[in-house]
Amino acid sequence: MMLRGNLKQVRIEKNPARLRALESAAGESEPVAAAAMALTLAGEQPPPPAPSEEHPDEEMGFTIDIKSFLKPGEKTYTQRCRLFVGNLPTDITEEDFKRLFERYGEPSEVFINRDRGFGFIRLESRTLAEIAKAELDGTILKSRPLRIRFATHGAALTVKNLSPVVSNELLEQAFSQFGPVEKAVVVVDDRGRATGKGFVEFAAKPPARKALERCGDGAFLLTTTPRPVIVEPMEQFDDEDGLPEKLMQKTQQYHKEREQPPRFAQPGTFEFEYASRWKALDEMEKQQREQVDRNIREAKEKLEAEMEAARHEHQLMLMRQDLMRRQEELRRLEELRNQELQKRKQIQLRHEEEHRRREEEMIRHREQEELRRQQEGFKPNYMENREQEMRMGDMGPRGAINMGDAFSPAPAGTQGPPPMMGMNMNNRGTIPGPPMGPGPAMGPEGAANMGTPMIPDNGAVHNDRFPQGPPSQMGSPMGNRTGSETPQAPMSAVGPVSGGPGGFGRGSQGGNFEGPNKRRRY
C-alpha cells in the first residue's frame, strides 16, 4: 500500500499511565498515527519485537486517536473529506456501504446511486479520507473492484488578480459574506511569493454560485487599490492518483500505441523530423505566451501608473470639492449669521421704537395727569388766595371794608399816617383835621363805616352810629376798587400832640367795627 512505507509501529502497554503518555506522544506525531491507523484498519500486525527483560509482561499493539488526525484549525466534514466510490454492486444497501467505512469514523453524508453503481461518503477529516482511500481502493466487493477517489469540489472557485498583500485569512474573510467558507488559499511560488491566484472552497454550491454571479456583475475589491478580483469556477485536477494502468481501457488505439517502447528518435529519421517540428511548434507557443504575458504585464504596469496618477487627481478633486463644500457651508453660515444679525437689529429697532412710544405715551399721560391735577387744584388755590386777601383786609365775605378812618381823612396809600380814632392822649375830644377822602360804603349786609367820628366837637355822642346816606361802592387800593365816602366834620387836635395828625400818627388798619357782624382781626 501507499502508506506502508511510512509505517512505524507503536507499543502500547497495559499500564494506564504509560498508555496515556504513549497516546499523547502519538498525537504529536501525525505521520506515525496515520501509519498506525492504516495498519490497524488493514488488519495487519507488524512482527512482534523481542520481549524486554525489564518489562516481560508488556503486550505489543496499536492505539488510534481520531483527534490526532485533525490539523490545527482544520474543519471537520468538509467537501475535501468527500470520497467518490465507483463500480459498486447494484444490490448494495446503505447499511453495507456504511459498514464498509465504519472503521474510519462516523460518516456524515451517504449517497448511493444503484442504477449507475456509484456513491459518495463524507468522513470527519481529510487524513481519514486519505487513509480510507488508500486502503479500500481496488478492494473486491462482490466480484467487483472498488474505485475510490476524492470527489470533485462543486463549490470551489478560482480567484485571480489578487494583490500581493492578500493573505489566506483576508481571502476567507472577504468571501465569507456569500456563505460559509471551508477553505481559502492564496497560491505561492517556490519562494513563498504570491502568484496573484488563489481558490476558495464553500460548504455548499448556492453560496459559490452567488459569489460567482456577484463578482462577475460587479467589481469586488479586497484592498484599497481599485483592483477587482476575477472569479471563475475552479478546474478540478487529480494530481495525486493520476491515471493508473489498471484503469486504462484496452482499446485498439491502446494496443497500437503500445507496440513501441519508450525511446529517443534518431537524427535524420522520419520520427526525428516530425518530432523536431512538434518541438518548434511548442517553442513558438511558448514564445507567444511569453510575449502575451509580457504585453499583459506592461499593460498592467501602465494601468497601475495611470491608476496612481488618477488616484492623486481624484484625491485632489475630492479635496477641491470638499473645499468648495466648506466654502459654500461657510457662505451659508455667513448668510445665516447676517440674517440673524438683521433680525436682531430689526427686533432691537422694534424694541427701541416700542420703548420710545411707551416713553412718549408715559410723558403724554404724565402731562395730562399734571394738567388734570392743575385743573382740579385751581379752586382750592383760588379760595386760599381769596381768604388771604380777606384776612389782609382787602375784602370781607360780607362786603367791602374801607381801611380809612374818620380820624384819618387821607385815603389809604396817602402820605402821613392817619390819627388814631381822632383822639389825642390828653383829651377825648375830637381833633380837627383835614376832611377825609371817600370812605367805604356800606356792604349789602350792613358793614360799618369806619369814617364816622365817635365823639363830635361838642363832646356829645351821636346816637346814630351809621350815617344815613346812599351806599357807596367797595373800594380798596389792594382790590383796585373805588368808592365814595361822605365828608366828615374836621376834628381839632387836643392835647400835647397838636398841630399834627391826630392820634399816634397811625390810622386803625382794621377799622372800628361795632356792628352785630363785627369781625375782629386779632
Swiss-Prot record:
GO terms (BP aspect): activation of innate immune response; innate immune response; membraneless organelle assembly; negative regulation of DNA-templated transcription; regulation of circadian rhythm; regulation of DNA-templated transcription; rhythmic process
Localization terms from the record: Nucleus speckle; Nucleus, Nucleolus; Nucleus matrix; Cytoplasm
Gene3D superfamilies associated with the record: 3.30.70.330, 6.10.250.1170
UniProt xrefs under SMART domains: RRM
GO molecular function, one term: RNA binding
InterPro entries, alphabetized: NOPS, Nucleotide-bd_a/b_plait_sf, PSP1_RRM1, RBD_domain_sf, RRM_dom
UniProt-annotated stretches for the region Sufficient for paraspeckles localization: 124-357
Residues bearing PTM Omega-N-methylarginine: R506
Name of this chain's protein: Paraspeckle component 1
Gene name of the encoded protein: Pspc1
